[in-house]
């Protein structure tokens, strides 16, 4: 062991402890950065739905289904209503949450007994529900909740970085220990 190289066990344990602590904090920073990336991506996906003032998770009432999703391209209300009436699904309530040239984001409420007709329209026009899990919060509130989580991770990372910088005081000790190990090994 370290003793046979003229290096004390206590010294070896101290150096090992410092190195392990630094590596552990570095791994935590990496994991937090990955989580921050995922949170930011979720926030971006939610942004088009900011105009929705009900939780995205609401999918039905006693008598109606509620759907949130998007269509490719820019759709106006007239075009949407025409697409639904062509399939005999006139009794739908549609809210255009946001519309851009490339996407139209919708919230649709319709009677449960019209589900087959509405699903046919969805297939025909390419209606796509969000790929993320729907929240029991409104999109605005969910973005705020995610932001709070992201800020906590950023703050945690700042703490780790400060702790790692404080470990600089052990750098000479670690280098000296490592050099002595190498020298002993080369004997």
What do these predicted regions represent?
Residues 1-187:
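Long, charged N-terminal accessory/stalk domains
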């Amino acid at each position: 062991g370290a003793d046979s190289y003229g290096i004390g066990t206590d010294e070896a344990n101290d150096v090992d402890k410092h190195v392990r602590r630094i590596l552990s904090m570095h791994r935590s920073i990496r994991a937090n950065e990955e989580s921050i990336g995922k949170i930011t991506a979720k926030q971006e996906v939610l942004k088009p739905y900011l105009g929705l003032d009900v939780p995205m998770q609401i999918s039905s009432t006693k008598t109606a289904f509620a759907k949130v999703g998007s269509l490719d391209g820019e759709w106006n209300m007239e075009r949407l209503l025409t697409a639904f009436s062509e399939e005999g699904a006139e009794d739908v309530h549609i809210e255009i949450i946001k519309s851009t040239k490339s996407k139209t984001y919708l919230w649709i409420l319709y009677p449960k007994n019209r589900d087959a007709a509405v699903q046919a329209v969805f297939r025909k026009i390419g209606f796509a529900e969000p790929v993320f899990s729907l929240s029991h919060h409104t999109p605005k509130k969910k973005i705020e909740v995610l932001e709070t989580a992201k800020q906590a991770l950023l703050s945690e990372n700042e703490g780790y970085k400060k702790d790692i910088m404080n470990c600089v005081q052990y750098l000479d000790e670690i280098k000296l220990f490592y050099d002595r190990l190498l020298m002993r090994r080369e004997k």
